[in-house]
């Protein structure tokens, strides 16, 4: 048993019904259902659009890689001011 037993959930459900009323909870449930349906439809439509589009050609790099010749120089450390 965790923090909430089944009896606790019954009491919480009764309090929620008393506070919001059954009509408002019914409307809330239908609104949530419509939102989930719309989300699923949008996801499926997006996946279908991706399937219909042909694979894009890989783009050529704008700048070809090149090597820069450089030479390291030794730098003297500044004198400490202790």
Curated annotation (Swiss-Prot):
<keyword id="KW-0812">Transmembrane</keyword>
<keyword id="KW-0997">Cell inner membrane</keyword>
<dbReference type="GO" id="GO:0008320">
    <property type="term" value="F:protein transmembrane transporter activity"/>
</dbReference>
<dbReference type="GO" id="GO:0033281">
    <property type="term" value="C:TAT protein transport complex"/>
</dbReference>
<keyword id="KW-0472">Membrane</keyword>
<protein>
    <recommendedName>
        <fullName>Sec-independent protein translocase protein TatA</fullName>
    </recommendedName>
</protein>
<comment type="subunit">
    <text>The Tat system comprises two distinct complexes: a TatABC complex, containing multiple copies of TatA, TatB and TatC subunits, and a separate TatA complex, containing only TatA subunits. Substrates initially bind to the TatABC complex, which probably triggers association of the separate TatA complex to form the active translocon.</text>
</comment>
<comment type="similarity">
    <text>Belongs to the TatA/E family.</text>
</comment>
<dbReference type="InterPro" id="IPR003369">
    <property type="entry name" value="TatA/B/E"/>
</dbReference>
<comment type="function">
    <text>Part of the twin-arginine translocation (Tat) system that transports large folded proteins containing a characteristic twin-arginine motif in their signal peptide across membranes. TatA could form the protein-conducting channel of the Tat system.</text>
</comment>
<keyword id="KW-1133">Transmembrane helix</keyword>
<keyword id="KW-0813">Transport</keyword>
<dbReference type="Pfam" id="PF02416">
    <property type="entry name" value="TatA_B_E"/>
</dbReference>
<keyword id="KW-0653">Protein transport</keyword>
<feature type="region of interest" description="Disordered">
    <location>
        <begin position="43"/>
        <end position="82"/>
    </location>
</feature>
<dbReference type="InterPro" id="IPR006312">
    <property type="entry name" value="TatA/E"/>
</dbReference>
<dbReference type="GO" id="GO:0043953">
    <property type="term" value="P:protein transport by the Tat complex"/>
</dbReference>
<keyword id="KW-0811">Translocation</keyword>
<keyword id="KW-1003">Cell membrane</keyword>
<feature type="transmembrane region" description="Helical">
    <location>
        <begin position="1"/>
        <end position="21"/>
    </location>
</feature>
């Amino acid at each position: 048993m965790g923090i909430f037993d089944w009896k606790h959930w019954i009491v919480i459900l009764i309090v929620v019904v008393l506070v919001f009323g059954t009509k408002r909870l019914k409307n809330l449930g239908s609104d949530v259902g419509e939102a989930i349906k719309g989300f699923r439809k949008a996801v499926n439509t997006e996946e279908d659009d991706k399937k219909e589009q042909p694979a894009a050609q890989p783009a050529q790099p704008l700048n070809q890689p090149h090597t820069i010749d450089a030479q390291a120089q030794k730098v003297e450390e500044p004198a400490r001011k202790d």
